[in-house]
Amino acid sequence: MKRTSTASPPYAPRRPRRAAAALAASAAVLAALLTPATAGAAPAPAATGAPLPTELEVIRAAEATALYGDPAERPLDQRKTSLISLGDSQISGEGVGNYEPGTDGPTNWCHRSKDAAVHRTTIPADVTYNVSCSGANSANIRIGGSPQYADELVQSDNLAVKARNTRIKQVLVVAGANDDLQFGPVMTDCVTRYLLLQGACNPKYGPGWQARVDGLVPKVTTTLGDLKKVMADAGYTEGSYELVLMSYSSPITPDFRDNPKFPGKLPGGCVGYDADARWGRDTAVPAFQKGLRAAARDAGATYLDGSRLFQGHEVCTDDTWVRGLTVDLSHPFPPDANSVRQSFHPNGRGHAAFAACLSALHGTGLREASCADPGSTGQAVLRAGAWDDAFGPLRAGTGVCLDAKGGDTLNDTALIGWDCTGTRNQGWWQSPDTGAVHIEATHDRCLDIPGADYRAGRSLVLYDCKGQPDQKFTRTGATLRPAAAPDLCVTLTGKDTPARLQNCDGSAAQSLA
């Protein structure tokens, strides 16, 4: 099926533009870094929707004429099918390049890429729409909200138009980072503090982070409810389309030095303190993810957990799906806040991963699903359920839990027995497909037998998940055994003692509940 990637047409200004204050180039590069630049049969939808306000009806008629040759609102069975994405820079294509005309400055910086995920899925559709915009918050999406730029519609209004001209199959939403969380300004501050040698930023933001998450959840919930109302007003019934909220993945990792070709923080674009990278991955993004999951549940939307999707592919890794710190001194010129706006956003490979997840999710009927690279494959794989429900401790009968020593996740981190704390360096999940045992802190590190040395007494470590035999384990009762050496068991004898392979003997140290 030939698919049309449709750029959002320009609209008559709805309110005066605000003049942007000129900034000194060097100050703008630092201060503006990452600041938001802003299954089963379903009831058939109604033939046509409720009338639109006059202003939107004019736009609808013009778009219908472009699609079909005349302005009539067609019955659903006579319409082209479509997909649509709404939200902020995470899904607009910020950082990918190849931006739609009119969205790459100087008066509109939505940065909608022609290579954004919505245009790259394998879901059969005649038309794909990307109405998301870099910097959008819930006020730019919800009913009665405000447009970001004079030539933009509120995103829910854009949805209302598209829903009456096409038969929408999937509505993708990625939103929340620019509400109370202010993820961009926080990232800006963290990077700026590093460049100016001012110390890590996580002590500043950590204590109030959960309150920020709690503040954004009702806004995202309301926004999703508004989008459902828009679809209902357009004649759609529950279940006749998919409403998907996808969560964000951390663009940074503290494990970048495991990249054998690590070029350095500045050349690689992964500027920031290691402690902040660890806080972002282990605390900030997981808390944000939990909030978005709650919003999707409360609104009755499908939840796609993307929180682990970029793990192993962050900035400065050997196969990055994220653009690092990027400063474009020529566009605009002289440089201003927009010179760095592409930094720390998904690149083309990141959007290909989004598209793979969305394609796999379509038509499954799942209310919750999650997506990640199963182990340095370069491919995104979907699984049913959210990641939060997958991980749990491996608690030995001796009373200790399998623990990544010091909370580290670098290659060759020692694994030990330790007091059970419920932290992410003690959470584990075994893939039913590969047998690999992933640690909760990052999907890119697995339980590993160094050198495939299958002998009693061999200590175990964390290592880059690679799908090799030395990372494949089986469960026999409560024991965990190497698939290649089933007479050996993972053994935890006590606190601060190494996790080792020992001959299986039925002891409490080998009973991992």
Could you tell me what each predicted segment is?
Residues 160-328:
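Alpha-helical cap/lid subdomain in secreted, periplasmic
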Residues 31-71, 367-368, 459:
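C-terminal region of N-terminal signal peptides and the immediate post-cleavage residues
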Residues 62-134, 191-192:
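Serine-esterase "nucleophile elbow" of acetyl-processing enzymes
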Residues 82-94, 127-132, 169-174, 179-181, ...:
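Structural recognition of the beta-strand scaffold that forms the well-ordered cores
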